[in-house]
From Swiss-Prot:
Role of this protein: Substrate-recognition component of a DCX (DDB1-CUL4-X-box) E3 ubiquitin-protein ligase complex of the DesCEND (destruction via C-end degrons) pathway, which recognizes a C-degron located at the extreme C terminus of target proteins, leading to their ubiquitination and degradation. The C-degron recognized by the DesCEND pathway is usually a motif of less than ten residues and can be present in full-length proteins, truncated proteins or proteolytically cleaved forms.
The protein's name: DDB1- and CUL4-associated factor 12-B
Gene3D superfamilies linked to this entry: YVTN repeat-like/Quinoprotein amine dehydrogenase
Listed Basic residues bias regions: 1-13
Annotated region described as Disordered, given as residue ranges: 1-31
Subunit field text: Component of the DCX(DCAF12) E3 ubiquitin ligase complex, at least composed of cul4 (cul4a or cul4b), ddb1, dcaf12 and rbx1.
Species in which this protein is naturally found: Xenopus laevis (African clawed frog)
Entry similarity comment: Belongs to the WD repeat DCAF12 family.
Pathway in which the depicted protein is active: Protein modification; protein ubiquitination
GO BP: protein ubiquitination; regulation of autophagy; ubiquitin-dependent protein catabolic process via the C-end degron rule pathway
InterPro entries (alphabetical): Beta-prop_DCAF12, DCAF12, WD40/YVTN_repeat-like_dom_sf, WD40_repeat_CS, WD40_repeat_dom_sf, WD40_rpt
A GO CC term attached to the entry: centrosome
Domain of life: Eukaryota
UniProt cross-references to PANTHER family, sorted A to Z: DDB1- AND CUL4-ASSOCIATED FACTOR 12 (PTHR19860:SF16), DDB1- AND CUL4-ASSOCIATED FACTOR 12-RELATED (PTHR19860)
Amino acid sequence: MTRRPVSRKRRATHGTGPGEQSDWDHSAHKRKRLQPEKKSLVFYLKSRELKPHNDSTYLHLLRGHAACTLPGILSEREFHLGNLNKVFASQWLNHRQVVCGTKCNTLFVVDIQTGQITKIPILKDREPISGSHQSCGIHAIEINPSRTLLATGGENPNSIAVYRLPTLDPVCVGDGGHNDWIFSIAWISDTMAVSGSRDGFMALWEMTDEVVNKRDFQHGLSRVPVYSHISHKALKDIPKESSNPVNCKVRALAFNGNNKELGAVSLDGFFHLWKAEQTLSKLLSTKLPFCRENVCLAYGLEWSLYAVGSQAHVSFLDPREPPQCAKSVYCREQGSGIRSVSFYEHIVTVGTGQGALLFYDIRAQRFLEDLTGSCREGDLLKLNTGKGWLNHNEMWMNYFSDIDSCPNAVYTHCYDSSGTKLFVAGGPLPTGLHGNYAGLWS
């Protein structure tokens, strides 16, 4: 008996044309039939090699394999941001949109498919800020665990501004807590966030149901966006451990949700640990192994480690271990500093002031090497950011006119939920230079 041939052709589905902007119509997506999830070539090849005992172990192994394989095959696509100055902070909103904050105090969303930039109105204090006020820009953007609220800086860089997700409608402004710029923010629960400031204090803010519901009620009565103003629930100062209290500025925060502990790095070269629940209670302070330019901090939940960036090293701290047990790795970026750091699986991604991305394997305790064959054996895998945009201003004319461009410091980077896309942004490292860089590595 001969088999009848079976046609495997399928009707083409109607989709959005290339370059078109899609709206945030969640109800429309619910009505559509879900398409089968696409698996990468790496997924299928690894699935033949591995025979796990259960799905969770299987997926964990695949994610770990992808984490150390993908950096070597990532390619860059730059975005044009106009004349914005230095992107300091970024977070993924969804699979195609990233929200960013800049030194020129601009909050915007970039669509990674179309490259379209949408600016978001920044929120103001109760009282107008003085005309002589100089803004340092937006240094922090953080999303709460349920991804319903986003916290960042306001028009006044001393204040914290909270927006609702996914609409980015304003919710409230926390003002009056700091008298200097906010450098970092960390959510310690769905409704409570901590801000760390250059004034040496950490402020605890609570977004109560009353605040959120009040905003909803007012918004229903007016077509003009309205928002509440809140005061801090607690205010704690960083211990003045060094001989120069002026340097006790809170530069970076990272939260350990399992132990309810908040790590903080101050510019005097100390790491501080706080119990963070309904208030902040100090647990310890310890001197960092390398204490110059400690401007970034991340927590790796799976490894129970804090990673701290310095001028040329990344130090790994386990609060349960004595300070002398801290391990530090040299990043071969002497002088430019480590500007951003993050954990994804067992890979720590490091962004430098010279516009490079490095990848450290915690399990192997070494940086990933370049295996493309284009470099010498033993050379580190290094992704270099593109040219970006540079304003040829007076500073450039006086000191940098002999060069057309300069490296873009990686002030911020973040992986999407799949771990296969890496958004990278920043700008020129010298203070007086005006420029920007943003790119998607995938």
